[in-house]
Design a protein with these regions (language model features):
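Conserved GTPase G-domain substructure that encodes guanine base recognition and part of the catalytic core
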Residues: 1-292
């Protein structure tokens, strides 16, 4: 895509200083979609490979196009996002963010990942010269507004919500210095979610991240309510045998004692399932499936 971001687009960037580190940081930036007025279709860029998905009409069950776009963005991005960052002064203060989070909370579970890996939310405000408030009181006000908008528990979709006020703009303070605290907060939040993913064995390599993201894109285009199942997606090219249950029952019928069950049957079944989930060519098959 061009450097100019059209309304409704989300552009993916890599944080340049982290590009060749062991901890590369990806940033997806965009505006809050407002698609109630039809716009012309985007023109494909010649320098980028483009692919499209036709939405199933059942995915557009919300009253407006904007709400439908919100639904799609959240269900697609949430399983792959560490932190959602909103700049309150750019979108009209707290109310638009409250409405958006309330909509997201009402959408239900976006994926089968553990709750501890859910993304965090950071709301950024700008201090004026006469700033007299504090982040804690502003956060309480925000959470009160959110509780009035929805009865859903925030922890259903997000692992935390925080608020950060940036220093007032001054001639002797560079933009880099103003935003240093923001970057530190984002990195700290991301590290916390990353640790949760490590602890639950759901931190994926870049190759698998890309493959799962493409699978999630097709899933979101095809269904409106079912959460994206990472395990099912990983088995697309190696589906579970339909008669697996029968084989397990027959095998266990031959186990006559608790000792045989613990010392023989359970280890054999466990190792067989693990080996079946990781055939020699599964990585290549998953990448080929994504390309197709």
């Amino acid at each position: 895509m061009t450097g100019r971001r059209a309304h409704g687009e989300i552009h993916l960037h890599i944080h340049a200083p982290s590009a060749f580190s062991s901890r590369p940081i990806l940033l997806a930036e965009g505006d809050l979609p407002n698609l109630d007025k039809p716009r012309r279709a985007l023109v494909a860029e010649k320098c980028h490979e483009a692919s499209s998905r036709q939405l199933d009409s059942r995915t557009l069950t919300t009253p407006t196009l904007s709400a439908s776009a919100d639904k799609i963005y959240f269900r697609l991005l949430s399983p792959f996002t560490d932190v959602f960052c909103f700049f309150a002064d750019d979108v009209g203060k707290f109310r638009p963010i409250v409405e958006r989070l309330a909509l997201w909370l009402d959408l239900g579970q976006p994926s089968t990942l553990p709750r501890s890996t859910r993304p965090k939310v950071l709301i950024v405000t700008e201090r004026g010269e006469d700033f007299a408030g504090d982040d804690e009181s502003d956060l309480r006000d925000f959470k009160r507004m959110l509780s009035e908008e929805t009865t859903m528990d925030v922890s259903e979709q997000f692992s935390d919500i925080r608020l950060l006020s940036l220093a007032a703009r001054k001639k002797d303070l560079s933009n880099r210095a103003r935003h240093r605290e923001l970057f530190e907060h984002l990195l700290n939040f991301s590290d916390q979610v990353r640790e949760a993913r490590v602890n639950t064995q759901t931190l994926f390599s870049a190759h698998y991240f890309t493959a799962f993201f493409h699978c999630a894109l097709s899933h979101v285009a095809a269904t409106s309510v079912e959460p994206f199942n990472f395990i099912a997606a990983s088995r697309i090219e190696n589906p579970v045998a339909s008669n697996l249950g029968g084989h397990l029952v027959d095998f266990l019928h031959n186990i006559k004692t608790p000792e045989k069950l613990l010392e023989f049957a359970i280890p054999v079944i466990t190792s067989s399932l693990l080996l079946d989930s990781h055939p020699l060519d599964i990585y290549c098959k998953l990448i080929v499936a994504v390309k197709h």
